[in-house]
């Protein structure tokens, strides 16, 4: 039953030519299951062992396909290389680039996910934030899903009765010509959009931010890819979210792993803001 519900959520069950959306519907007629064919583009892991691999995900690539019309996701590379038992072990937003861990079989996926859920993984991100940040920050602000009916479904909010969320921010370099600070962000908890919302909360929004600090029509235009690249730059400061998963450390099967991204976030982020 759970597998059938999962397939319905993903739009992969069809009855007499119509996509099934009602989970409790009684079905009769010709029922089809849509099977995905992988569409790899040659992205290779930067590290792998027998049980897992680590990819440096480009910005704009989904970790999982989000429906029948998704042309490409990291899943295409994962299944092509390791088969359909392989899966990502944690989240990484579509526009966030950087390190993402992939279990090669069901057992590895389960055990890796437990490490992330139990906060046994050190994660470090690099971001380019608006304004000058001169000293280390420790941001403690509870978070939850935005509950306003008119709000964007995926957006989070700061609220006293939300879940505990703590982020440490370390300034690395200030660029006066673009009034932005390159920072290292270390989330001590694992809330959705945590770094993004916390930096917005302390008035140092990440450049390129498509959700926080924008009006609903602007957000929808960005998410629906109806906003031009020039307008996106003028609206948010960059044509993509300037947040990168840079370093990850954990212990797995008795071995300590410390994996660093090969992406030069400082140079690339500066060029994206300075030259578009």
What do these predicted regions represent?
Residues 1-276:
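RNA pseudouridine synthases
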